[in-house]
């Protein structure tokens, strides 16, 4: 039963997506509204209103739209409403014809798509209202990127799950953050990945997909100048002798290149982690690159990638789907654990790596999804490799320092508190003054 729960969590929290997941979620919501409009006999929307939470707007406003030169949630909404099929979920924009994309762009340029801040308690909230021919389609996504809770046609609900909790309103295979937080611990993840998991026979297809699919977008990011071309330039620096090509730089290159391509809107899929493609790339590609550098066998690599992604999921379950802190710090912490395992570290050593990551990169701010996400990712991967190298020697940030506690679970809880309650000095001081010095069980 427990092993099945690990698989359920992986399948619930890891999924295929194209482009940034926030514009993808906007396009999905708009596709539901547009479909409702078409069922009323209207071929296409004439005007669109998007009401979204601050976090959604922050993450969607500068992200590239896959396969186009456009960026932002207004274009995502228009594309979704005019030609999106909700069945494709976060890949909805991948299946829209070019002529429909251009019609959507014309609608945006004509000022017919409005984006407003929704005054709601949820960090992840999207409402799209599409109008045309005297009819109205309306849809709402809430809490999770694909959790459609309301669809209306001319004011009549064809789907209404607003009063249901997240688990009940979504797919039956969805595991809620609360369920994940109560089930996953660093110890249980370690024991599962190193003692129970049979990576060559257990149904971890999503992990294999993450390795394969995210490797493709990483290679794509190296093939041309996407965005700031962080991965490509790191690779060039190695070729010029300005940097040493080693495990750390290869891991940085692999992750940053994938984010370069994704943020620029390359029409290439990723396997996301906890609703974020960049987090999926960051939790997967540094570990894959390290395994290739160390010439590690496939079963061990798959264990390490699973470990990394589950650690990221565990942190994110309390961190919040969307946050004021950068998700690369979360996924980078997972990567640090995966790399520590590849370097021969045990449970104590991965705990040290986690403490080192929290002591180092905590506080990196999320200021939206955009090209320089790749720069932040490269920084977090560099920190992950350093944390792993220190951790394998048993070196860790001490519980006298900052928000790091003696117990790794409490350190991660402190990390989550900063994400959910802000990063003010008063919050930080409160965490520093109220520590539990109970050591980890060995």
Feature-to-residue mapping (PLM):
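Flexible, glycine/charged-enriched surface loops at secondary-structure junctions
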Residues: 40-47, 88-93, 115-116, 201-208, ...
